[in-house]
Amino acid sequence: MAQLRELRNRIRSVKSTRKITKAQELIATSRIMKAQARVEASRPYADEITNVLTALADASTLDHPLLTERENPKRAGVLVVTSDRGFCGGYNANVLRAAEELQTLLREQGKTPVLYVVGRKGEAYYRFRQREIAKSWTGFTDRPDYSDAADIGETLVKAFLAGADDYLDDGGPDGTLGVDELHLVHTEFVSMITQKPSVKRVAPLEVEYSEEPQKTLRPVYDFEPDADTLFKALLPKYINTRLFAGLLDAAASEHAARRTAMKSATDNADEIIRTLSREANQARQAQITQEISEIVGGVEALSSAGSE
């Protein structure tokens, strides 16, 4: 009887947990669609600012720091994008592993990594390991805005423009720790099932030269003010756009990973409920069989006593 009561309590407990995981799965499914729509909506702007910058680069003679490779780079900023909440399977573990691999590579190249972290999970990971974080941002990983990317971009560009040569060991007068490179580590959304860690260098920008003829002619612009001024003003915005795209990608990946994890948890709960229900039925059958045996035995004993 005690075993049957325990099994029924466990079934009720698992069913209660299943309600939570199923609700989380449905919420994540709904949010994936919205996150994907935001990723798609941001692409036209990203494509257009890239085209404008390409035209400006052709017309400009400006040697901007964001385009210039530093000699003997000493420090590299690493922005790691994690989630604020859990229940998303290996999402955070995978991106943190990619970040650790990047930092190991940078150290082998003689560069000191400077950590910038997005998300409470990444912040907790590095705090627990007593790793110094230059700056962190939390509270928006599941639905980032452009203003969040602009805030991050302002900090990173400021650190990059300061450079590591000026302040080798400590921050400058305003506390900015200069770096010679900027890297972004986030999760790239491939599909509802597949999300993969991505490592990209954000600055200095890598300019690609192609000898292949263009398939379409680019429009010819007259710039007002001059191309150099516009180029200088748009480059930081381009950095912000790349960061925003990374944040949107990471948000979609987070929701997809959470949906997969919650669906797996719900399926596991269903399997546990089936197993426990089968055990409870067997225990109940055994109990009934025992009760019948006791009744039959009692009747036989009474019959024997009566015949005597």
UniProtKB/Swiss-Prot annotation:
One of its GO terms (biological process) is proton motive force-driven plasma membrane ATP synthesis. Pfam families: ATP-synt (PF00231). It is a peripheral membrane protein. Keywords: ATP synthesis, Cell membrane, CF(1), Hydrogen ion transport, Ion transport, Membrane, Transport. The keyword Cell cycle does not apply. It is found in: Cell membrane. InterPro entries: ATP_synth_F1_ATPase_gsu (IPR035968), ATP_synth_F1_gsu (IPR000131). The keyword Cell membrane applies. Transmembrane segments: none annotated. GO terms for molecular function: ATP binding; proton-transporting ATP synthase activity, rotational mechanism. One of its GO terms (cellular component) is plasma membrane. NCBIfam families: ATPsyn_F1gamma, PRK05621.1-2. Produces ATP from ADP in the presence of a proton gradient across the membrane. The gamma chain is believed to be important in regulating ATPase activity and the flow of protons through the CF(0) complex. Belongs to the ATPase gamma chain family. F-type ATPases have 2 components, CF(1) - the catalytic core - and CF(0) - the membrane proton channel. CF(1) has five subunits: alpha(3), beta(3), gamma(1), delta(1), epsilon(1). CF(0) has three main subunits: a, b and c. This is ATP synthase gamma chain. It comes from Saccharopolyspora erythraea (strain ATCC 11635 / DSM 40517 / JCM 4748 / NBRC 13426 / NCIMB 8594 / NRRL 2338). The gene is atpG.
